[in-house]
Amino acid sequence: MKHTFFAYLARMKYIKRWGLMRNSVPENDAEHTLQTAMIAHGLALIRENIFHEPCDGEHCAMLAVYHDVSEVFTGDMPTPVKYFTEDLRDRYQEIEDKARERLLQTLPDELKKAYRPY
């Protein structure tokens, strides 16, 4: 079996995001993911070091890195559409869950447990 996990992740740079507002510069999933991870990490560090509340910055950053990986199979859907009705939101969540599981199946068994939390 070929392990194509990282090849699929490399596709994120080809997935165009749906901006909620008119954007002067289009954004792809890879760019969005990097920005999200940096912000998540920074906010976690602020929580831990300024507000003195426990928060694992590295874990937050990794959650952000993998938060849109299902889109390598589904593409991006505009947020207003995704949440238009409760039923549509639930159905789309099922699709995203199946896409994430499909992606996990491209990993060797020894690595699946390490990636599953994300």
Predicted regions and their residues:
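Short alpha-helical hairpin
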Residues: K2-L20
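Short linear capping/connector segments at secondary-structure termini
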Residues: N23, V81-F84, Y115-Y118
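Alpha-helical phosphate/pyrophosphate-handling elements in metalloenzyme active cores
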Residues: S24-E58
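An active-site-proximal "capping" alpha-helix that borders the catalytic cofactor pocket
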Residues: T36-L43, E96-Q105
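Active-site alpha-helical segments that house and flank conserved acidic catalytic motifs
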Residues: M38-A44, E58-M77
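Aspartate-rich (DDxxD/NDxxD/DxxxD) Mg2+/diphosphate-binding motifs
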Residues: E53, T74-E86
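Histidine/acidic-rich helix-loop-helix segments that form or flank divalent-metal centers
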Residues: E58-M62, Q105-Y118
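Divalent-cation-assisted or electrostatically stabilized phosphate/pyrophosphate-binding catalytic cores
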Residues: V81-A99
